[in-house]
A protein has these predicted regions:
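An amphipathic, basic-hydrophobic helix/alpha-beta surface used to engage anionic
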Residues: 1-195
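Exposed, interaction-prone extracellular/peripheral surfaces
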Residues: 82, 110-113, 117-301
Length: 301
């Protein structure tokens, strides 16, 4: 039965269901759930209480359970993202570059020393007696990297600001993926289980958007996180990932620490286009003293 006439919920942690059924009978209960908060929620265990054969004793069977629900963050309102979209899309359009598309065959030509052997067409080479390679048409690639900083902006941490920043990241990712733009994410927010920093490599499509939202949903803001300026400085080191000039970087950060501004301005000057979105409460200042560009203010309601 789908009704809850024999169910009681004592609090938000325990739920009691009473069933009476015969041998070889199965009861399926569907429990509606309203998800009001981003995160990973687990049903850690089940207890079955039943009477003995002669109804003179009470038995309890405990069972472990690994069921979990991952609640995606609420994406920021697309209408509020329009000013951000026009700025990001304009930069991404200017930063687009051409790549060979292996699915669009154009023809065959003679092999040169700059060609890869994987492009050699062996059948055509056997017919002509010379090495021949496949040629492909080019396609346009645009890339945006979302830099999500969740460190506190002052002495206190405000959950509303953190959640709004995550919501903005989800909304921007959804908006860009719908435009065919490759999106990646680098955040100092930590995974609820592994405690590793969230990093999603570039990609596009619905599946990739699900990966991004899953990673954002699994962030636990209560876990101590690395200072974001230190993370970005590691990116600038020669032995690590370099700042890519063909990328547009979108920083979402309520924190405007001077060290962070200095590092961001350094990245901006390395031929990297930067858009800084500052979530802030109404009336708060969100200016950047040490950067050569203007931020985008995002009011937290």
């Amino acid at each position: 039965p789908d009704t809850d006439t024999n169910s009681s919920v004592s609090d938000k942690t325990y739920r009691n269901d009473v069933f009476s059924f015969l041998a070889n009978q199965r009861i399926t209960r569907k429990v509606p759930v309203r998800c009001t908060k981003r995160g990973v929620f687990r049903i850690s265990g089940l207890e079955i209480t039943f009477a003995g054969l002669f109804m003179n004793e009470i038995n309890v069977l405990k069972s472990e359970n690994e069921c979990e629900i991952t609640v995606y963050p609420k994406a920021a309102d697309a209408r509020e993202l329009k000013p951000v979209n026009s700025r990001i899309s304009g930069e991404a359009q200017r930063k687009k570059y051409m790549l060979e598309d292996p699915f669009v065959f154009r023809g065959i030509r003679d092999y040169t020393s700059n060609d890869s052997l994987k492009n050699v067409n062996w059948k055509a080479s056997a017919r002509t007696g010379n090495l021949m390679v496949n040629e492909y048409d080019e396609s346009v690639s645009r890339n945006v990297c979302i830099l999500l900083n969740l460190e506190e902006s002052g002495a206190l941490r405000y959950d509303a600001v953190d959640e709004e920043a995550i919501s903005i990241a989800s909304g921007i990712a959804e908006m860009l993926v719908s435009q065919g733009i490759n999106v990646s994410i680098i955040s100092n927010g930590c995974d609820v289980d592994t405690h590793n920093h969230v990093f999603v490599q570039g990609g596009a499509g619905t599946g990739h958007l699900n990966n991004i939202n899953t990673a954002l949903a699994r962030i636990d803001t209560g876990i101590a996180m690395e200072e974001y300026s230190a993370m970005l400085e590691k990116i600038l080191e020669p032995d690590n990932m370099r700042i890519e000039s063909e990328y547009v970087y979108v920083l979402i950060s309520a924190s405007r620490r001077k060290k962070l501004q200095s590092v961001i301005n350094k990245i901006s000057r390395l031929q990297a286009d930067m858009v800084w979105i500052v979530p802030h409460f109404p009336g708060d200042d969100y200016g950047l003293e040490l950067c050569d560009f203007e931020p985008v203010g995002w009011e937290v309601k």
